A protein has these predicted regions:
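Bacterial Sec-dependent N-terminal signal peptides
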Residues: 1-29
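N-terminal accessory beta-strand-rich subdomains and adjacent acidic, glycine-rich linkers
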Residues: 29-278
Length: 278
């Protein structure tokens, strides 16, 4: 009986130690609505960061993962710790001399989530759309190995897909293209193999509502392509790796052609503002 109690005590101690060693990631939930309150984006911060979008109760984007992989095995968005949040109401006029209108009204609600790992995540909710972007708060220059931008739009929803028009089969081979093609109209899970698509891309969602995926404020950073080689419900981002060597070529020798690439996508300054994902 005494030996049984000793063994039972050992088991209890072992289980206690195991429970202590298991990491616990408390979930944090955030919600942001458009000024007219018809659009709502929900953000969940746990082991990963996901967000979803609903319009008048209809889900137009299912929970989708976003993150950035930084050099040295670090991440923006993996096991991230929230330090604070800030909410703003934006109501301003933007002068636009190169657009069809000379002024644009910029009205939205904004949520800024700050993280211990050295970045902010900004969400904006407009009456007609949602956008997010990463902002670095790091004090030194750094390298971005990869960015994860997923769009869980539903496997059977139909999409208008602008595939890259090229004979190249590899992903890096498809990067050299004219960004011109007709749109293929097909269900998301009928995506054509390893083909990449450029932006914008449109998906028909619940109750005949449309979701357009694009980006903005793109500077010193690769443009986003989309792929769905798994033929499932989620479109995934793909970014051109950073050029390592180039040669002169193309039409009339007017272009620089990438002949070799590095194993990362961007070299960034401290406190970089990354492109908006819209």
């Amino acid at each position: 009986m005494k030996q049984f109690r000793i063994n039972l005590l050992k088991v209890a101690i072992t289980l206690s130690l195991l429970l202590i060693c298991i990491p616990i990631f408390p979930q944090k939930h955030f919600s942001l609505k458009s000024p007219d309150e018809k659009l709502e984006v929900k953000i969940e911060v746990a082991q990963t960061i996901t967000y979803s979008i609903a319009h008048q109760g209809d889900i137009v984007l299912n929970p989708s993962t976003i993150a950035m992989e930084i050099e040295g095995g670090k991440h923006f968005g993996i096991n991230a710790k929230v330090t604070k949040e800030k909410r703003n109401k934006i109501n301003q006029t933007i002068t636009s001399p190169y657009y069809k209108k000379d002024k644009i009204e910029d009205t939205c609600n904004e949520l800024v989530i700050s993280f211990r790992e050295g970045f902010h995540l900004v969400f904006r909710a407009y009456d007609d759309g949602v956008a997010y972007r990463f902002i670095s708060s790091r004090k030194q220059d750094f390298i971005v190995k990869n960015e994860i931008a997923e769009f869980n739009v539903g496997a059977t929803n139909r999409a208008y897909i602008p595939y890259v028009k090229t004979e190249q089969k590899s992903k890096t081979g498809q990067l050299f293209n004219s960004f011109e093609n007709t749109y293929a109209n097909t269900s998301v899970n009928q995506w054509e193999g390893e083909r990449l698509a450029f932006l914008p891309l449109l998906v028909e969602t619940t109750n005949n509502k449309k979701l357009v995926i694009t980006e903005a404020d793109l500077e010193n950073y690769p443009g986003m392509f989309l792929e769905n080689a798994d033929k499932d419900a989620t479109l995934k981002s793909f970014f051109a790796p950073y050029p390592k060597t180039m040669k002169q070529g193309g039409h009339n020798m007017l272009q620089e052609l990438v002949t070799e690439r590095k194993d990362y996508i961007a070299e960034c300054r401290a406190k970089t503002l990354f492109p908006w994902r819209i």
